[in-house]
């Protein structure tokens, strides 16, 4: 449900409701005047207490002795009429009789089961209020009334209540406390109707709306079928799930469970602070973590990816902050790794800085791109989602770009480089990949498509060694840099059958500018210059590695390219 649209609708409703009520009651007053005109055509008629007579244009009710009744109701044809202290028929006015309050219309008749918009009984200059007069004509006071299937509340002065209404002793009054859970608290719209199964956007019940200050904020509330504000978790509100705190305020952004039924926001929405929430999602140790969007949305997200600010930065007005991808399951739980149930692995994040660099440190740079605590090393957790493999940090933020695991955390002792795609991608890649460095230069990578550890292939990890006639290091294609042919060293890790840990060996390869491995025992020239002299050498079963102790010093290169 788009609550932002509803907010605009409620504003329009407030503007039109008062006009509607005035028009409705005006019709009732005119009709009563017509009745009076009809009665005025008579000079006298019988009443239960005596006889009505018109004298000098005014109606009086006389007893059998000919004395005019005063300050009492006289009944005629089943209708009650009131005569005042001068005996005259009272019209369109309040009447107080034996401590009870009534209202007579323009015909002088006591109204019953009807409404009046009028000034209070004892103050004609005060603002008009709505009053309801029951079947006996008495003003409704300190009570709840059902009228045409709708519920209304009235205070001790009989004024119809709107906005937040609370039980006060044996009666009802404007709300004075924000405690909607431990009190009978309801909300009535501008027409006085108690809202049920409805949303309302307003200040908290304890806010004096005649004295609102900058610290007061409006919030969304949901009024259940009972009329009371929802607290805790409320499911199936037009098919969506929402969360509310103990005061009934709809929770937004990051929401966590605090007790058996309680929920709270895990971010700082106080405009008077710097907006920074100190506790990360992993530090909360909450049994439930949800994401509910902003106040114009508010429902719990589920079975989807969401891109949002971390909870420690959510609500901050800072353009330097980054959004992260989070995964939410079908139950609406945000995935945040649980160390009691799963084991993470140490890793370092990298970005491809210069794919043409001579060394790993030239090619890759450590990167703190994806964590609000500004760290590079991290513990990452593997999770399969929709048949794809993703990695997350301890706060549930999806990782991207390159990550290289810590060898000490790997059972086989091999550090593995993975590629997780860009910011809006994130799943672990395998096979051949073309990736651009920071300067926009495209580089070719290859990541193993399965485990073949005895040949040095580890599933989805960047290959170290030969694959399909090409040479790779941490998955990056190794090519000749300055000369047409060059010797390149790569450390190869293999796990022999029946073993659990890997053996490392440095292998030397002859490669050309395209990264193709050369396997002929001959002189390799760049123009007329011999740049690699491999005559007399053999090539091993490591798919093209030079055979002499894998030591590059045994092969002549450049100006010393001789046998």
Report each predicted region and the residues it spans.
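Extracellular adhesion/carbohydrate-binding repeat motifs centered on closely spaced tryptophans
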Residues: 2-563
């Amino acid at each position: 449900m788009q609550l932002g649209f509803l907010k605009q609708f409620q504003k329009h409703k407030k503007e039109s409701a008062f006009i509607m009520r005035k028009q409705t009651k005006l019709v009732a007053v005119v009709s009563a005047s017509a009745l009076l005109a009809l009665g005025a055509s008579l000079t006298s008629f019988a009443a239960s207490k005596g006889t009505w007579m018109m004298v000098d244009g005014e109606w009086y009710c006389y007893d059998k002795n000919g004395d005019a009744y005063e300050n009492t109701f006289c009944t005629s044809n089943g209708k009650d009429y009131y005569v005042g202290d001068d005996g005259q028929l009272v019209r369109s006015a309040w009447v107080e009789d034996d401590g009870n309050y009534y209202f007579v219309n323009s015909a002088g008749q006591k109204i019953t089961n009807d409404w009046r918009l009028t000034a209070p009984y004892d103050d004609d200059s005060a603002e008009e209020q709505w009053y309801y007069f029951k079947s006996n004509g008495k003003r409704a006071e300190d009570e709840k009334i059902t009228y045409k299937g709708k519920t209304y509340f009235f205070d001790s002065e009989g004024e119809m209540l709107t906005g937040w209404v609370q039980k006060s002793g044996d009666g009802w009054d404007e709300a004075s406390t924000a405690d909607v859970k431990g009190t009978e608290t309801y909300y009535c719209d501008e027409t006085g109707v108690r809202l049920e199964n409805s949303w309302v956007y307003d200040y908290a019940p304890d806010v004096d709306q005649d004295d609102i200050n900058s610290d007061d904020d409006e919030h969304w509330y949901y009024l259940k079928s009972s009329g009371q504000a929802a607290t805790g978790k409320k499911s199936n509100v037009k098919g969506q799930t929402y969360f509310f705190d103990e005061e009934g305020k709809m929770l937004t952004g990051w929401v966590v469970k605090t007790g058996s039924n309680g929920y709270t926001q895990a971010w700082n929405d106080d405009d008077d602070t710097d907006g920074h929430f100190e506790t990360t999602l992993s530090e909360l140790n909450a049994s439930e973590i949800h994401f509910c969007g902003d106040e114009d949305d508010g429902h719990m997200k589920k079975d989807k990816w969401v891109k949002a600010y971390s909870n420690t930065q959510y609500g901050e007005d800072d353009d330097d902050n980054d959004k992260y991808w989070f995964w939410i399951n079908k139950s609406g739980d945000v995935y945040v790794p649980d160390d009691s149930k799963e084991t993470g692995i140490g890793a370092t994040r990298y970005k491809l800085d210069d794919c043409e660099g001579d060394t790993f440190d030239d090619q890759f740079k450590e990167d703190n791109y994806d964590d609000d605590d500004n760290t590079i090393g991290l513990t990452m957790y593997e999770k399969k989602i929709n048949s794809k493999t993703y990695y997350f940090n301890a706060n549930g933020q999806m990782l991207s770009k390159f990550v290289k695991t810590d060898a000490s955390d790997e059972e086989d002792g091999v550090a593995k480089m993975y590629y997780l795609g860009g910011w809006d991608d994130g799943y672990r890649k395998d096979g051949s990949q073309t990736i651009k460095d920071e300067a926009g230069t495209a580089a070719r990578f290859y990541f193993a498509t399965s485990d073949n550890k005895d040949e040095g292939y580890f599933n989805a990890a960047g290959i170290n060694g030969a694959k399909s006639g090409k040479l790779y290091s941490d998955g990056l294609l190794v090519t000749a840099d300055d000369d047409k042919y060059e010797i390149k060293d790569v450390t190869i890790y293999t796990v022999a059958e029946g073993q659990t840990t890997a053996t490392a060996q440095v292998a030397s390869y002859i490669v050309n500018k395209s990264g193709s491995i050369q396997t002929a025992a001959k002189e390799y020239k760049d123009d007329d210059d011999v740049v690699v002299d491999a005559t007399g050498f053999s090539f091993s079963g490591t798919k093209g590695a030079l055979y002499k102790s894998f030591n590059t010093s045994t092969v002549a290169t450049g100006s010393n390219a001789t046998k």
